[in-house]
Amino acid sequence: DKPIRTEESLEGTVIYKKTTTFEVDGYTYQCDVDDGSQFVTLYNKENKLTYKDIVYKATGKIYIGSWNEKKVIEYNSSMSWQEDFIVDQAFTKAMADELGKREFTITMLLSPDTGKVMEVNFNFTTFSPYARVPLHVYREIEVKLKEQIHFKPGEVGKQLNYIMLSWRQKPQGKLPPLPPPGSLM
């Protein structure tokens, strides 16, 4: 008996185990691995801010946020929901099941002028199942976040060279489409 639905699962081997550049389908991603911690930073090679400090545009001084200061963005619950939805939908249900309860980190770098997503990067370890997720999944998340997400920069956010928003998520995955009624697979 064949399964009724087939869908992509995680790769059998670790994809992101050492510092490497990946060129796939017209886009280039950089995977940086810290040899000691095995911590992975995965990002579009075109990114320019991944390792840049957040600074005040006027002074060049490094920005150090605090819980009691004015907001860098105006919170928008529908945008936060949309971020989670985009991540969930990029993973198949089979992938999500294989990931178990483990989370990975998604970081968006926003324009201080428009609040739109300029860059995205991902963090996980070489020994987590996220190191076996195909590159096109991370690419889909990046593209959709850039297309669909924007926040209103706050008073402080407007003064910075970029705004960083980061969160950890355990993807739920999407179900594959059902076959048309009456068809047999």
Regions found by a protein language model. Give the residues of each.
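Charge-biased low-complexity segments
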Residues: K2-M185
